[in-house]
Design a protein with these regions (language model features):
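Short, structured motif recognition centered on aromatic/hydrophobic residues
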Residues: 16-20, 49, 92-96, 100, ...
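Short loop/turn motifs at secondary-structure junctions and domain boundaries
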Residues: 1-3, 29, 76-78
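Helix-adjacent hinge/juxtasegments
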Residues: 48-85
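A positional/architectural concept
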Residues: 5-18, 22-42, 46
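Acidic/histidine-enriched, glycine/proline-rich intrinsically disordered or flexible terminal extensions
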Residues: 134-153
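Beta-rich strand-turn-strand
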Residues: 84-107
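C-terminal end-helix/capping segment
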Residues: 113-140
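Extended intrinsically disordered, low-complexity coil regions enriched in Ser, Thr, Gly, Ala
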Residues: 29-34, 41, 103-117
């Protein structure tokens, strides 16, 4: 199974379109998903994006719930009512919905970050802050609260 990996700085064109990184397009193609499934990230800092695996993962969260329950109603609104399937041009470009860009504080260039079954689209400033948190958390998980002697940060 292919995964979304790596980080890419992407430029927008004069029409506000951005190219999905080629490596990510290949994963989307392998998933046989038409378009790009986009949803605000749970913390509201970025845009979650992907194909069939992201869509299926969210659907599986609902599958065990009573479809008449309030929990199902709330989650289905968050997962599907707040999402959009964005058209991917044959050249691999997309125009992200304005509401998603505003929510993620994206104004122009974007950072695409692989997350395995999905990827995220960030504003460069927000991602720089988040990246530092992620790396600090990874160091804590790998080495505990203390970094081993001689380790590079």
């Amino acid at each position: 199974m292919e995964a979304f990996v790596s980080t890419f700085d992407m430029k927008t064109d004069a029409k506000g379109r951005v190219s999905i990184p080629k490596a990510f397009r290949e994963v989307l193609k392998a998933e046989s998903f038409s378009g790009l499934y986009c949803i605000p990230s749970p913390d509201g800092q970025a845009i979650d994006a992907g194909g069939g695996r992201l869509f299926s993962m969210l659907q599986s969260k609902l599958d065990g719930l009573d479809p008449t329950s309030m929990e199902y109603d709330l989650l289905s609104t968050a997962f599907f009512g707040e999402s959009e399937i964005v058209n991917v041009e044959k050249e691999g470009r997309v125009t992200l919905p304005t509401r998603f860009q505003e929510q993620a504080d994206i104004e122009g260039d974007m950072i695409f970050v692989g997350k395995g079954y999905k990827f995220q689209i960030w504003s460069p400033g927000r991602y720089a802050t988040y990246r530092q948190q992620a790396l600090a958390q990874a160091r804590t998980v790998l080495w505990g609260s203390e970094q081993p002697a001689g380790a590079m940060s």
